[in-house]
């Protein structure tokens, strides 16, 4: 079984923020798989379906970003999911908005959701889909920026970015990390 985790914060006040782009991609992926994300389990919202013939669980942790690892570890232990079968989708300020970067393993890079997952899994070897949200301009606080709404320009591009992110996720699950990196890394998906 594969576990696809979209990182974000629960609640309507966070729904359309940059920090919740992981939720948005995971929700779009589940929708395209025909999976309903309504069941509460593992301190998150989950749905299970088949992606390219393999059972795949989509998880949206409801623990708030800084405790995402609690939800991920709970699902992994309950379902016997190996670390290499975990894919985490998250916002990345070090990439421009519209870019996607597939990565195998690595540190948390200051991202508290990743920090929680790495700390509680005791391992950093899971797959990541890093979603570029860009850096704040001027003296804007990073936390305020990622917890802020997308700009009107970003909103106009968001559907295209999400569609390409789902394509990247599908290639990652079907053909592996190297193929997904070759096809999607170092590209910006803006119209």
Curated annotation (Swiss-Prot):
Its EC number is 3.1.1.29. It is found in: Cytoplasm. GO terms for molecular function: peptidyl-tRNA hydrolase activity; tRNA binding. Its main location: cytoplasm. GO terms for biological process: protein quality control for misfolded or incompletely synthesized proteins; rescue of stalled ribosome. The record marks 91 as: Stabilizes the basic form of H active site to accept a proton. Keywords: Cytoplasm, Hydrolase, RNA-binding, tRNA-binding. The active site is at residue 19. One of its GO terms (cellular component) is cytoplasm. It catalyses: an N-acyl-L-alpha-aminoacyl-tRNA + H2O = an N-acyl-L-amino acid + a tRNA + H(+). The record marks 9 as: Discriminates between blocked and unblocked aminoacyl-tRNA. PANTHER family: PEPTIDYL-TRNA HYDROLASE. Hydrolyzes ribosome-free peptidyl-tRNAs (with 1 or more amino acids incorporated), which drop off the ribosome during protein synthesis, or as a result of ribosome stalling. Monomer. This is Peptidyl-tRNA hydrolase. It comes from Syntrophotalea carbinolica (strain DSM 2380 / NBRC 103641 / GraBd1) (Pelobacter carbinolicus).
